[in-house]
């Protein structure tokens, strides 16, 4: 009798994706982050669902409904902090996943990579709208500042901002629609992740060497299922440690103050995972220029496959490219630090230099370095 998992219409899809999938025998722990992102998404959807049962998207009651969740709902505090810190874990995994793709040349799978960039935008949009929902000071002012950036768009800017606000300022209408979008987007992200996997399984996984691994494949189960479970356990360990020992470590104290349109906080800043983009935005004195730089800071990832000039796919055997890759990582960490600092000397100039270096590295330095390495190999 034929195995049911190979014949049943639904089970054979699961089988070909997670059980009998041929995988390269040498993929390292850097390939764990795809499954970790899936786990993060499931955690976020489940905790978000339970939070939505008690949350009210009204300016008068939003803040107190979050307080009610933490104080009166059974394990409400746990669900709320799992959701808030789960977002941070999501972004840590995302950045490491993208970094892995850049280092090992995974961007050469064009469709998979482009869906990934789209996913990054969708997750960032979801996280931004989620940050507005508790209706604290930083929620309100963060929403005001970021949505106001759209007014930099010529001709239609002002109308567009008022259309998004649903009025003349961030108010009840804005909060209600942000809640609606924040609820629906994770399901769209889940669907996109399915498409991401579909395209990936058309080509098969890349591997650290960047070479074709068709001659040496192993089944996904049990080898990589066990490996992924180890990653998931470590992720849950870090997340629960964060939630149970210092749940507010990555949050902003200002968000424990009810939103007040008449009182601007001294330093408006987003969550830590947006700080690098926020630093790039702030480093350009012109409003429209800043908005373009902000969008390009993520959109530049879509250009990476077209800037690949090396004869080798992976950076594994390219020491000079490796060097510039780690400079790029250091530059992003610098931008993250600058994004959390006040707009004053010397932070302004450091932010401007780090922003220029970010675009220079991706668009100019790394492609030229790859050409230089080709010559070293007499190719």
Curated annotation (Swiss-Prot):
Binds 2 heme b groups non-covalently. Keywords: Electron transport, Heme, Iron, Membrane, Metal-binding, Mitochondrion, Mitochondrion inner membrane, Respiratory chain, Transmembrane, Transmembrane helix, Transport, Ubiquinone. A ubiquinone binds at residue 201. It is a multi-pass membrane protein. The chain crosses the membrane at residues 33-53, 77-98, 113-133, 178-198, 226-246, 288-308, 320-340, 347-367. GO terms for molecular function: metal ion binding; ubiquinol-cytochrome-c reductase activity. The keyword DNA damage does not apply. Heme b b566 binds at residues 97, 196. Heme b b562 binds at residues 83, 182. Heme 1 (or BL or b562) is low-potential and absorbs at about 562 nm, and heme 2 (or BH or b566) is high-potential and absorbs at about 566 nm. Belongs to the cytochrome b family. This is Cytochrome b. The gene is MT-CYB.
